Amino acid sequence: MQPVLQLMSRVGPSDANVLITGEHGTGKEVVAQTLHALSNRASRPMVTVNVGGLAEGVFESEMFGHVKGAFTDAKTDRVGRFDLADGGTLFLDEIANVPLNQQAKLLRVLETGELERVGSSKTHRADVRILSATNANLNEEVAAGRFRGDLLFRLNTIEIHLPALRDRREDIPALAAHFLSVHARRYRKHLTGFDSAALQLLLQHPWPGNVRELDHAVERGALMAQKNAVGAADLGLAASRDGSIQSGRLEDMSMEEVESFLIRKALTRHGNNVSQAANALGLSRSALYRRMQRYGI
């Protein structure tokens, strides 16, 4: 992670737009928060928008705002996310999910800094730095006609790629120790670390949910531990190294653990493509996002 940290330290103080890439749970929002904190805009707001979680048809109103009477449900004026972030940073998570028919409008705002609220012809300016994140390959999205190449160029002044946790296992002990310290303090427990079996399990687990899943597992371990050291059973990691449910464990799992496992399997099977995983699970994208947040995936 040292090259990533060095790049963040160089890019953070600038006003450059940054595209943060990596699988779900690799810490993209943490990187965005750090870049904002390093910038000259740190005293101003950082506004986060989960583009993938926006209901269909509301992107323009959410981002640019609207005036009363602009459409049937517009009972009052609404301030958009660009205006809320004025002078600060706007973080667009899951940027690949911006509707294609709205991408030209977003591009224009990024190029000019000018926007109009829905239902208004009055143009005004918003001074924002754009940080965006995605787990998708945007070059492939451009080639497939689902994402505008000119918008990608505007967003991607600098790209910061976060490797999957399974590709940097040497970071697991330090990350786990950090999360344990945080959760031990939160739950007012005296915990000295992990026993050897727990540490071995942490090092061998496939971590399809990456750092977020590790944090979730360590939090559970902190809650469940009855000794000073967290044990393997406390972590609630029901999957083996190859990601399959261990023999004899299914009947011991709660409904929440089974659902969490199935979501992780679907994401792994579909290359962390949320739309495809949601379709395979019979869920809407927004429903899957809610479950992923619930289970720390």
Predicted feature descriptions by range:
Residues 104, 108, 116, 153, ...:
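Base-recognition residues in the alpha-helical recognition helix of bacterial helix-turn-helix
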Residues 4, 26, 49, 63, ...:
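Conserved RecA-like P-loop NTPase ATPase core
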Residues 6-73, 83-99, 164-169, 190, ...:
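Conserved post-Walker A coupling segment in P-loop NTPases
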Residues 1-7, 255:
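N-terminal pre-P-loop "Q-motif" helix
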Residues 29-34, 61, 94, 105, ...:
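The short alpha-helix immediately C-terminal to the Walker A/P-loop
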Residues 20, 27, 33, 249-297:
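Bacterial C-terminal helix-turn-helix
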Residues 47, 74-87, 91, 99-105, ...:
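AAA+/SF3 P-loop NTPase mechanochemical coupling elements
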Residues 2, 13, 39-44, 119-129, ...:
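Nucleotide-binding/hydrolysis machinery
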